[in-house]
Design a protein with these regions (language model features):
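Conserved beta-strand scaffold positions in the cores of enzyme catalytic domains, especially
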Residues: 447, 478, 498-500, 642-644, ...
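Active-site-adjacent "gating/activation" loops or surface patches in catalytic cores
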Residues: 27, 410-467
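P-loop NTPase motor core of the ASCE superfamily
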Residues: 103, 108-110, 129, 151-157, ...
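H-loop/switch region of ABC-family ATPase nucleotide-binding domains
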Residues: 480, 717
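P-loop NTPase motor domains
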Residues: 2, 20-21, 33-39, 45-63, ...
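The start of beta-strands in P-loop NTPase/AAA+ ATPase cores
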Residues: 29, 120, 475, 641, ...
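Post-Walker A helix-loop "phosphate-sensing" segment adjacent to the P-loop in P-loop NTPases
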Residues: 154, 467-477, 496
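Extended, folded cores of ATP/NTP-driven motor/assembly subunits in large transport
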Residues: 1-410
Length: 830
């Protein structure tokens, strides 16, 4: 009869106190730590060498026995979905709620079918340092493990890895659940699993049950393990599992840095266990002395032309090298590697095993199963820093600690920042990428720049990101100086406000308007500042001087004075003076008075004599001429959370003025509340940078000051050479801690590399063409974006839901298909 055994018996865990795992048979105290990886493959050769060297140094601080465990798991996006559900419940716009639901469905699908996350753990046991004391207290053990953990943490932080573990019992339980219960953890996230176990005990023992009263193995022991079918595999919770090892004589003779990553990067359904055992140097020296003596004696009796003589000389040289290395303070180590391969069926598991074995043969390595030792291999794979001696002996390879640096395993890179928005999938590993550019602990500022030539997917990437930021509750402002209509569908679909500024358009923003600001949040932070606040009118007139310098760029000092006097008189005609209280309309419950328009200023300039004549004449076009739509009161609403200002219908001559009006209005709104996130996005920024010097200066100002108002400035641009050659372009890049680079031609890639530090591999990928030819037409595949944030570089495949794609695509084929579908629906409706 087949035996199905509860794996509670396999755990050998007595308890978990704080974050210390206490095992039995034998009794051991083990600390488990988790570390984030780095994007090692995209580092330059010199950076890789430095990391390997640093890891070699780090190994000297490691305990005598160290277990490194790497697991591949489906990406857990439950916390991001939970946050999005919360935002959805608070959302007032029904259109936005529908978009949030679409994104949640996509995230659920991604986590089940595509997303893979690599997690990296280190476990090590408490070891006595000698002496007569054999019964240390738990506090002494915990203190020793804590110090060792801090030493490992500091050493790995020097390599670029940060710790992800928390010194708590619940974290340790969740980590063990992920490491041991692969099938369960894929079907039931930790939060749900924890709640189910606790509720089960509450039903049986009452409401006073807490985490400490429940046997710890209930949280991380699989439901069952069945090893009776075959000596070559076992079944754990319905998952087929085979444990394998790298034979001692099958390791690479010359290893490149990070070679250990080939095991968990080639196939998703694997985990890797790597043990490092430092041997006693005195014992090794005694053994070496004996072996060297015997080999020297043997060498005297062997002919120098014999093959045996060469082998013996090599052995002697290796022995002397080890002896000298130990004398220099290096550690003599034995390492061993075990690979666990999972499958949803027997055939699936065997196919993956054969695929991995053939892959390793091509790497001049070998892979063998732990035949007849599946239960022992299961116990060895538990992250308790232990191992089966027989399996270890089959796989062990001696190596000096200084050479172990090439085994550096923390080489994947995941980017799942708490509170971030989903951008897409990590191109290298398939894991989802969540970016929170507002995280001040990671980023000096929240600004972003998106670079790419025409047709590379800049606007697609920008709109995808902005829609998701809006779904997170962030206020979005977009200025579109080119093809603003591309934003219209997405804006309206999420319940936004689409504003077109152009001659003949009914919508208008009055540049003369002094807008009342909501200072409630600032007053809570700074106290009521009414008494110290400067004159609002003076600040407004200063802004208007900048605006009129666009209309009259060569204005003389006399004309500036005439303009200033005319502005003061114009506002005075409406009862507005330098006193801020004069702005209040006594008949409208604290609202501001009616504001002048350009036509009112035009009249004052007409009365200013010859010195005001030139400004008067140039302003006439905006009052009674073809651009008279600028001479209207404001009739748009900026209270919406997604606002697009389309200035693309303006001529090159009028564009700087339209841009100034739009950004002036948006900045007024953005500066009101320093506690709420907001984004000012400028698409096709090169258009504004070229429009005029003042336009470029204003854009730079936005990028510099927005951080102080809990904001982010996001720019998307082509014509990279011109922008980067411009002093203002360089200032914007310096004030943007995050850059997104899309595929570009050689010339543009080289221009970017001059201001952004890229490796040769990154340059190759950027210059790679993304065009495919089909049926005589060119179609661009989904863009792969290189995100450069601080020292981290990662290629991301932008992923949009079907709903999002239909709203933001600019592909003629996609739009034609949408038009056909809409026409068909209309015909069916009629």
């Amino acid at each position: 009869m087949k035996q199905i055994t509860s794996t509670q018996e396999f755990m050998n865990v007595l308890d978990i106190r704080d974050d210390i795992i206490i095992t039995q048979n034998p009794t051991q105290y083990v600390k488990l730590m988790e570390f984030s990886p780095i994007n090692f493959e995209l580092r330059s050769p010199s950076e890789q060498d430095a990391i390997i060297s640093q890891f070699s140094s780090a190994l000297r601080t490691f305990p005598r026995n160290t277990h490194i465990k790497i697991i591949n798991t489906p990406s857990d996006v439950s916390s991001f979905i939970k946050d999005l559900r919360k935002k959805q419940a608070e959302e007032e716009q029904p259109e936005c709620r529908a978009m949030q639901e679409s994104q949640i469905e996509m995230l659920q699908k991604v986590s089940k079918t595509q997303g893979v996350t690599r997690r990296f753990f280190i476990s090590f046991p408490y070891e006595t340092s000698g002496g007569f004391r054999t019964s240390p207290t738990f506090n002494e053990i915990q203190s020793t493990l804590f110090k060792q953990g801090r030493s490992i943490q500091a050493a790995l932080e020097a390599c670029g890895n940060s710790t992800l573990s928390y010194e708590s019992k619940e974290y340790t339980l969740s980590a063990l659940y992920a490491c041991i219960c692969k099938a369960q953890s894929e079907a039931e996230p930790w939060d749900q699993h924890l709640s189910r176990i606790v509720e089960k005990y509450k039903e049986k023992f009452g409401e006073d049950v807490n985490l400490d009263r429940i046997p710890v193995t209930d949280f991380f022991a699989p439901e069952q393990i069945d090893s009776s079918y075959s000596p070559n595999y076992t079944i754990i919770d319905g998952k087929y599992v085979t444990y394998c090892y790298i034979p001692s004589n099958a390791y690479p003779t010359q290893a490149v840095g990070g070679w250990l990553s080939i095991f968990f990067s080639y196939i998703d359904d694997v985990s890797v266990d790597f043990w490092i055992k430092k041997e006693d140097p005195e014992m090794i020296q005694r053994r070496l002395q004996f072996e060297l003596k015997n080999n020297r004696i043997k060498s005297r009796n062997i002919d120098e032309v014999s093959l045996d003589y060469d082998d013996l000389m090599n052995t002697l040289d290796a022995g002397y090298y080890i002896k000298q290395s130990i004398a220099n303070g290096d550690d003599y180590c034995n390492m061993a590697t075990m690979i666990t391969i999972y499958g949803n069926s027997l055939d699936d598991m065997n196919d993956k095993f054969n695929e991995m074995r053939e892959f390793l043969i091509r790497q001049d390595m070998a892979l063998k199963r732990c035949t007849l030792q599946m239960d022992e291999a299961f116990r060895s794979a538990l992250p308790f820093a232990g191992y089966n001696k027989k399996i270890f002996a089959k796989s062990k390879r001696n190596v000096m600690a200084s050479q172990l640096g090439s085994c550096y395993p923390f080489t994947a890179y995941e980017l799942c920042e708490k509170g971030g928005v989903f951008l897409g999938l990590n191109e290298a590993y398939g894991s989802p990428v969540f970016v929170n550019n507002f995280d001040t602990a990671r980023y000096q500022n929240a600004n972003m720049m998106i670079f790419g030539p025409s047709g590379s997917g800049k606007t697609y990437t920008l709109m995808c990101m902005l829609l998701r930021m809006r779904q997170q509750g962030t206020q979005i402002f977009v200025v579109a100086p080119l093809k603003g209509f591309e934003f219209k569908r997405a804006c309206e679909a999420i319940g936004g406000e689409f504003i077109q500024i152009a001659p003949g358009q009914p919508q208008n923003i009055n540049i003369m308007e002094i807008r009342k600001k909501d200072t409630a949040a600032s007053d809570l932070i700074d106290g009521n500042t009414d008494s110290t606040r400067g004159s609002v009118l003076v600040a407004k007139i200063q802004q208007l001087h900048r605006f009129f310098s666009i209309i009259v760029p060569d204005m003389t000092a006399t004309e500036k004075q005439v303009l200033d006097d005319a502005l003061v008189r114009t506002y005075g005609n409406f009862g507005i003076t330098h006193r801020n209280k004069s702005l209040i309309d006594p008949n409208k419950n604290g609202e501001y008075k009616k504001m002048p328009v350009l036509g009112d200023l035009h009249k004052e300039l007409n009365n200013a004599g010859d010195d005001g004549k030139r400004i008067y004449n140039l302003l006439t076009r905006f009052v009674t001429g073809s651009a008279r739509s600028f001479n209207q009161p404001t009739n748009v609403n900026l209270d919406n959370k997604f606002i697009v200002v389309d200035v693309s219908q303006l001529t090159d001559e009028l564009l700087p003025m339209g841009m100034f009006i739009a950004l002036d209005y948006i900045l007024d709104k953005a500066e009101q509340d320093r506690t709420k996130r907001k984004v000012i996005a400028i698409d096709e920024m090169w258009k504004l940078m070229k429009a005029s010097q003042l336009s470029a200066e204003f854009v730079v100002e936005v990028f510099k000051i927005i951080r102080g108002y809990a904001g982010s400035a996001v720019g998307a641009t082509q014509d990279l050479g011109d922008v980067l050659a411009n002093e203002y372009g360089a200032a914007i890049i310096n004030n943007s801690k995050t850059k997104l680079l899309l595929p570009m031609d050689k010339k543009e890639a080289e221009a970017v590399s001059k201001v952004i530090d890229l490796t040769s591999e990154e340059m190759k990928k950027l210059k790679r063409t993304e065009m495919t030819v089909a049926a005589g037409t060119q179609k661009r595949r989904a863009s792969n974006v290189l995100m450069v944030a601080n020292t981290n570089h990662i290629f991301i495949k932008i992923k949009a839901s079907k709903t999002e794609h239909d709203l933001i695509t600019t592909s003629a084929d996609d739009l034609a298909a949408q038009a056909r579908r809409n026409a068909q629906l209309a015909a069916e409706h009629n």
